[in-house]
């Protein structure tokens, strides 16, 4: 489990001091909960995020243990180091919005016919309770030929999950190479 500290002082000076000591600044929030300003060791946070098997993982901040989902993060444009992360508390029974990654499987037929596979959506917006949250959407592109596309409406959605993205939006497609 990832352990962090609660930041008492908020501001640029305090954040810079924590970053200098190897901490990652984080905000933790959720519906009906008070926001928590936290900090995690950067290397520990990266290890924990890489080894997790689900979108939801546990963190301990101060005396609280919370199940959270990574909502957003900021990286340094030059060094690509993590600078900041936003975490949303995944509460059981509370319907909330999440971003779920898309995994593509198979090799499209259109690639052999001088086509190019284009993935226009890497994450899809869904609305569901934390216990119904899928880890990813798996799309099989093996039947796609040049000019074909898989739309949001073509994705099989588990029970209790609602898609927020429009039905007509293309997720992945094969286009003719120029």
UniProtKB/Swiss-Prot annotation:
Q: GO molecular-function annotation terms?
A: 5S rRNA binding; structural constituent of ribosome
Q: Which CDD domains match?
A: Ribosomal_L25_TL5_CTC
Transmembrane helix is among the record's keywords: no
Q: Which UniProt keywords apply?
A: Ribonucleoprotein, Ribosomal protein, RNA-binding, rRNA-binding
- Is Ribonucleoprotein among this UniProt entry's keywords? yes
Where in the sequence is the signal peptide annotated?
A: none
Database matches in Pfam families: Ribosomal_L25p, Ribosomal_TL5_C
For this entry, list what GO says about its biological process: translation
Give Gene Ontology CC terms.
Answer: cytosolic large ribosomal subunit
Q: Which InterPro entries match?
A: Rbsml_bL25/Gln-tRNA_synth_N (IPR020056), Ribosomal_bL25/Gln-tRNA_synth (IPR011035), Ribosomal_bL25_b-dom (IPR020057), Ribosomal_bL25_C (IPR037121), Ribosomal_bL25_long (IPR001021), Ribosomal_L25_dom (IPR029751), Ribosomal_uL5_bac-type (IPR020930)
**What's the family?**
Belongs to the bacterial ribosomal protein bL25 family. CTC subfamily.
Q: Which PANTHER family match?
A: RIBOSOMAL PROTEIN L25/GLN-TRNA SYNTHETASE, ANTI-CODON-BINDING DOMAIN-CONTAINING PROTEIN, RIBOSOMAL PROTEIN L25_GLN-TRNA SYNTHETASE, ANTI-CODON-BINDING DOMAIN-CONTAINING PROTEIN
- Main function: This is one of the proteins that binds to the 5S RNA in the ribosome where it forms part of the central protuberance.
The record's note on quaternary structure and interaction partners says:
Part of the 50S ribosomal subunit; part of the 5S rRNA/L5/L18/L25 subcomplex. Contacts the 5S rRNA. Binds to the 5S rRNA independently of L5 and L18.
What protein name does the entry list?
Answer: Large ribosomal subunit protein bL25
């Amino acid at each position: 489990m990832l352990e962090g500290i609660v930041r008492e002082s908020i501001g640029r000076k305090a954040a810079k001091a924590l970053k200098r000591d190897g901490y990652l600044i984080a905000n933790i929030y959720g519906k009906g909960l008070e926001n928590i300003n936290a900090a995690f060791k950067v290397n520990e946070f990266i290890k924990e995020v890489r080894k997790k098997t689900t979108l939801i993982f546990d963190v301990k901040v101060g005396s609280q243990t919370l199940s959270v989902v990574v909502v957003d993060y900021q990286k340094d444009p030059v060094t690509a180091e993590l600078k900041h992360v936003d975490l949303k508390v995944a509460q059981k029974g509370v319907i909330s919005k999440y971003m779920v990654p898309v995994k593509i499987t198979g090799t499209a037929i259109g690639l052999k016919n001088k086509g190019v596979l284009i993935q226009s959506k890497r994450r899809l917006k869904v609305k569901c309770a934390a216990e119904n949250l899928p880890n990813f959407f798996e799309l099989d592109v093996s039947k796609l030929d040049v000019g074909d596309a898989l739309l949001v409406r073509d994705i099989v959605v588990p029970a209790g999950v609602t898609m927020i993205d429009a039905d007509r939006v293309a997720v992945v497609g094969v286009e003719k190479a120029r």
